[in-house]
Design a protein with these regions (language model features):
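Membrane-embedded alpha-helical signal segments
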Residues: 1-163, 209, 345-367, 373-430, ...
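Generic detector of multi-pass transmembrane helix bundles and their immediately adjacent loops
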Residues: 166, 170-173, 177, 184-195, ...
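Short, well-ordered coil loops that connect the C-terminus of an alpha-helix to the N-terminus
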Residues: 215, 323, 370, 433-434
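Short hydrophobic/aromatic-rich motifs at helix boundaries and adjacent loops
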Residues: 178-179, 221-222, 285-289, 332-334, ...
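Juxtamembrane "helix exit" motif at the C-terminal ends of alpha-helical transmembrane segments
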Residues: 50-57, 139-151, 172-181, 275-286
C-alpha cells in the first residue's frame, strides 16, 4: 500500500478517537476484580504447594534402603533398650544426619525415624511450612511480573490463570506421588533419589502449557517447576537443570504442533534430550556403567510418561477450560466437519465467500502478529447461520428474482440480522470453541443494515425511522481477530462490485471500507491500532490484487450472458447512486445487491 493510502486511514479518524497509534505504549490496567481473583488463586496455590513440598520424614524399617539422605528436623531425646535390656537415652541434634542416601537403615536410625514419626505434624513444623509457603509465593511473584510485562492480557482472563495454577499444582503433586511410587521399585533395585528424579514425567506440564496457552508462559512455568522440584529433592543441583532443559525442549517441540500425533514426536525428542542430559550428568559425576544404564532407563520412562500424560489430558483441558488450541482449530478446518459440509450443500455461495474471507483474514492476522489459524477458522464459520435461510442472501441467489421484494424492509432487516444469532446457536450446538463463537457473534458488531434502512425511509418519508431497529444486535468486536474477520468480510463483499480493477482502485476501495467501519465506531472495543489497520489494509490489497489480476479475452470464445451481466451491474451502480448506501457486511456497496446480501 502506498504512502498516500496509508495516510488516508489516519486522516479520516477524528482526533478524539480511542483508536490511536499510542495505545501500545500505554500501561496495562487490570480490572480490580480479576486482580483480586488472581491474587487469591496465587495465595491458595502457594499454600497447597507448600503443603505438598514440605519434606516428610519417611518411616523406614531396619534393613530398608534409604532413597535420600535424612536429617533430624529438630533436636530430640530417645530412649532405647541396650544389649542387657537396660534403657539407654541418647540425643539427636537438629540437622544431624540420620541415614545417608543409598545405605541400609540401622536399628538406631529406625528408632530415631519412628520417634520422629510420632511427633510429626504441621503443628510441630509450622515455621518450616510458613517459610516454604512464603518462598513459593515469592517465586510466583517473579512469574507474575514476567506475565504482566510480556502477556498482560492473560491477567484479565481468570479462566486461563486458573488453568495455569492448576497445571502447576498437578505437576508438582503428581511428581511427589510418582516419586513415592517409584521409590518402592528403586528400593528393590538399590537406586538413589537422583535416578528416581530422572523418571518423573514433569516435562508434560510445560508441554501442556505451550499447547493450551503459549511458549512464553511455558518457559516461565518450566522455571517455576524446576526451582520447586529442586526444593523437593533437597537442593540437588542437577535435578532442576534436568527438568528445566527437558521442559523447554518439550515446549519447543510443540510450538508448531498441527496434529495430535505430533505429541508422539515431541515425546521422542524429549526422550533424546533427557538421555543426553543424563549422560552428561553421569559422566561429570564419574558414575559406573550400571548406574548410568539405570539412569538412562529412568529418563526413557520419564519421556514415555510425558507423551502418555499429554495425549490423555490435552482433550480434557481443551473441553473443560474451553481452550482453542491450534490442533483443535486445524481439526475444525477439515472440509468433512459437519457444519462445513452442511454449509457447502445448503449455502454454496456463502461457503465460497467464507473461503475467500479466510484467505484475507489469515494473511491479515499473520501480518499483525495474531493467530492466523483462529482467523481462518473464524472466517470459515462466521456465516454458518445462513444455513437456515440461504435464499435470502445474495451469494446464494442464482436468479434476478429477489425474495426481499415481497417483504417489508423491517422484516427483511430482521431476516438478515438473524443469521448471527442462528450461527451462534449452531456453533454452541456443535460445541465450537468460545473463541470461534465470539467471532461469529461479533463479526457484524452493531453495524447498520443500510439498504433496508434507506428503503424504509423512502417508503415512509414522513415517519421517523429508528436507526437502531436496522442495526445488528452486536456486540462489537472485542478482539483483534474478530475485528479482522469483520474487516475482511466487508472488504471481500465490496470487492465483488469490481471488474478488472487497477491496483489503485483496490487500495481505494479497501481504505474506504475500513474507514467507514472505523467511523461507525465498530472497532472501539478492540485493541487495533492505526499501524495495525495500515498493515491489515496492505495485506488485503495484496490478496485482492491476486484475485483480480488482469485477464485477456481468448479469440473465438464467447461468454454467454457476459454482456447481459455487465449491463445488469451498470444498472445496479446507477441505482446505488440514488440511494447512496454502502455495504456494511450483510449488505454490499450495491443497493440492489444489498436486498439480497448477507
Amino acid at each position: 500500500m502506498n504512502r498516500k493510502n496509508d495516510e488516508t486511514i489516519e486522516k479520516i479518524l477524528p482526533k478524539n478517537q480511542t483508536l490511536d497509534a499510542d495505545r501500545e505504549e500505554r500501561p496495562t490496567v487490570i480490572s480490580p476484580v480479576p486482580a483480586l481473583i488472581n491474587t487469591f488463586i496465587a495465595l491458595i496455590t502457594s499454600v497447597l504447594l507448600a503443603f505438598v513440598l514440605l519434606p516428610r520424614i519417611p518411616i523406614l524399617e531396619k534393613g530398608e534402603l534409604a532413597t535420600r539422605t535424612i536429617t533430624a528436623p529438630y533436636a530430640l531425646s530417645i530412649e532405647s533398650p541396650g544389649p542387657d535390656k537396660t534403657m539407654i537415652f541418647f540425643k539427636v541434634d537438629k540437622g544431624e544426619e540420620i541415614i545417608e542416601a543409598g545405605h541400609r537403615v540401622t536399628e538406631r536410625a529406625a528408632r530415631i525415624l519412628a520417634e520422629i514419626g510420632r511427633h510429626e505434624g504441621i503443628g510441630n513444623r509450622f515455621q518450616a511450612y510458613v517459610g516454604l509457603a512464603a518462598l513459593v509465593l515469592m517465586i510466583f511473584y517473579l512469574f507474575y511480573r514476567d506475565i504482566r510485562r510480556y502477556r498482560p492480557a492473560l491477567l484479565g482472563d481468570t479462566r486461563k490463570i486458573l488453568l495455569l495454577a492448576l497445571l502447576l499444582f498437578l505437576t508438582i503433586s503428581v511428581s511427589q506421588v510418582a516419586k513415592q511410587f517409584i521409590s518402592l521399585i528403586a528400593d528393590k533395585l538399590q537406586l538413589d533419589i537422583m535416578t528416581i528424579g530422572f523418571a518423573l514425567p514433569l516435562a508434560s506440564g510445560a508441554m501442556l502449557v505451550c499447547l493450551l496457552l503459549d511458549f512464553h508462559l511455558a518457559l516461565g512455568f518450566s522455571f517455576v517447576v524446576s526451582v520447586l522440584l529442586g526444593i523437593s529433592f533437597q537442593g540437588d543441583p542437577f535435578i532442576p537443570v534436568y527438568y528445566f532443559m527437558g521442559s523447554i525442549v518439550a515446549a519447543l517441540s510443540v510450538i508448531q504442533c498441527k496434529k495430535r500425533t505430533a505429541v508422539l514426536k515431541a515425546g521422542a525428542l524429549t526422550m533424546l534430550v533427557n538421555l543426553l542430559v543424563i549422560g552428561c550428568i553421569d559422566f561429570y559425576q564419574g558414575e559406573l556403567l550400571m548406574r548410568g544404564l539405570y539412569d538412562m532407563a529412568a529418563g526413557f520412562l520419564g519421556a514415555v510418561g510425558v507423551t502418555m500424560i499429554v495425549s490423555v489430558t490435552l482433550p480434557f483441558f481443551e473441553a473443560v477450560f474451553d481452550i482453542a488450541t491450534d490442533i483443535k482449530l486445524l481439526e475444525l478446518l477439515d472440509p468433512n466437519q459437519p457444519l462445513l459440509k452442511e454449509l457447502v450443500y445448503k449455502s454454496p455461495g456463502t461457503y465460497h465467500h467464507s473461503i475467500l474471507i479466510g484467505n484475507l483474514a489469515e494473511a491479515a492476522a499473520e501480518t499483525i502478529g495474531e493467530n492466523p489459524i483462529l482467523a481462518r477458522v473464524g472466517a470459515y464459520y462466521h456465516d454458518i447461520g445462513k444455513i437456515h435461510k440461504p435464499g435470502y442472501f445474495i451469494e446464494n441467489q442464482r436468479t434476478v428474482e429477489n425474495k426481499h421484494d415481497r417483504l417489508m424492509p423491517s422484516l427483511s432487516s430482521l431476516i438478515i440480522a438473524s443469521h448471527v444469532k442462528e450461527g451462534v446457536d449452531l456453533a454452541r450446538e456443535h460445541k465450537l470453541p468460545s473463541a470461534v463463537i465470539d467471532i461469529i457473534q461479533q463479526h457484524h458488531g452493531t453495524s447498520l443494515i443500510s439498504f433496508f434502512y434507506q428503503k424504509a425511509k423512502e417508503l415512509q418519508p414522513f415517519v421517523a425511522i429508528a436507526e437502531e431497529d436496522y442495526r445488528y444486535p452486536g456486540p462489537r468486536p472485542r478482539t483483534k481477530v474478530a475485528a479482522i474477520v469483520m474487516l475482511a468480510d466487508s472488504v471481500e463483499a465490496a470487492s465483488r462490485t469490481l471488474y478488472n480493477p487497477p491496483t489503485q482502485r483496490i487500495q481505494a476501495l479497501t481504505n474506504s471500507v475500513i474507514n467507514r467501519i472505523v467511523l461507525d465506531d465498530q472497532l472501539s472495543m478492540c485493541d487495533l491500532t492505526l499501524k495495525d489497520l495500515q498493515d491489515i489494509s496492505g495485506s488485503f490489497n495484496l490478496i485482492l490484487s491476486g484475485i483480480f489480476h488482469q485477464r485477456i479475452d481468448y479469440p473465438g470464445i464467447e461468454y454467454p450472458g457476459e454482456h447481459k451481466r455487465s449491463d445488469y451491474q451498470v444498472k445496479k451502480h446507477t441505482e446505488e447512486k440514488k440511494v447512496g448506501a454502502g455495504r456494511n457486511k450483510g449488505e454490499t456497496l450495491n443497493p440492489v445487491d444489498e436486498t439480497r446480501a448477507s
